[in-house]
């Protein structure tokens, strides 16, 4: 039985992911966040464990990793945190890591949309290039998800993925679609997602900027 630790479990993608995993799998879930007990609404206490913690609190992080098979990190923004997470995984022998980050960290967003994207989030991209490098230099079976601009739509779970070295595929993707992809990665037993950095977008959204801007 697989146990998944969700770091940043109060985040929007995380909350969609939890409901998807409860519905589509029998995995046990550890939900780690600041003030988690106040912010997270547990629907299945037999499968969900809530952990109040901070990524920089090495002790709580290490305890949370016990008996975990996979880790999902909802936000790859903070370099010291990402380093601590990798160390805690190594200390506990946890191999599978999935991390959500922004598009543009591999200079893969081309054309007018690429220029717009850089003008909007250049400092975010610069910061997240560093966290991605830490993950890629680790010995983890990582899947880095470079996400298009996000929106919410329960009825729209369409996504497509591009590999490292391919131009990014579109401007936007729903958080629900991202949760569906993460669930597919966690359920996969072939290893095809290991040590991959994937661009994620909704098909047929190749615009100059997201449709909601």
Predicted regions and their residues:
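Glycine-/Pro-rich loop/turn segments that contact NAD(P) or position catalytic residues
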Residues: 77-162
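Residues in the short beta-alpha loop(s) of Rossmann-like NAD(P)-binding domains
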Residues: 10, 35, 103
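NAD(P)H-binding glycine-rich loop region in Rossmannoid oxidoreductase-like domains
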Residues: 4-5, 16, 31, 36-92, ...
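A generic structural motif
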Residues: 24-29, 193
């Amino acid at each position: 039985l697989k146990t998944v630790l969700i770091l940043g479990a109060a985040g929007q993608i995380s909350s969609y992911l939890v409901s998807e995993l409860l519905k589509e799998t029998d995995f046990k879930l550890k939900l780690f966040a600041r003030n988690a007990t106040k912010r997270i609404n547990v629907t299945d206490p037999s499968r969900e464990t809530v952990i109040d913690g901070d990524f920089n609190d090495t002790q709580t992080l290490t305890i949370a990793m016990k008996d975990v098979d996979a880790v999902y990190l909802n936000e790859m923004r903070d370099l010291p945190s990402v380093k601590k997470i990798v160390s805690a995984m190594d200390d506990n022998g946890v191999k599978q890591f999935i991390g959500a980050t922004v598009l543009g960290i591999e200079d893969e967003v081309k054309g007018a949309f690429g220029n717009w994207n850089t003008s909007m989030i250049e400092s975010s991209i610069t910061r997240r290039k560093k966290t991605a490098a830490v993950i890629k230099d680790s010995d983890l079976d990582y899947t880095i998800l470079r996400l298009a601009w996000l929106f919410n739509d329960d009825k729209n779970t369409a996504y497509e993925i591009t590999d490292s070295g391919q131009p990014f595929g579109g401007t936007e993707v729903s958080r629900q679609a991202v949760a569906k992809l993460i669930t597919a990665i966690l359920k996969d037993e072939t290893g095809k997602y290991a040590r991959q950095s994937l661009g994620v977008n909704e098909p047929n959204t190749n615009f100059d900027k997201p449709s909601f801007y």
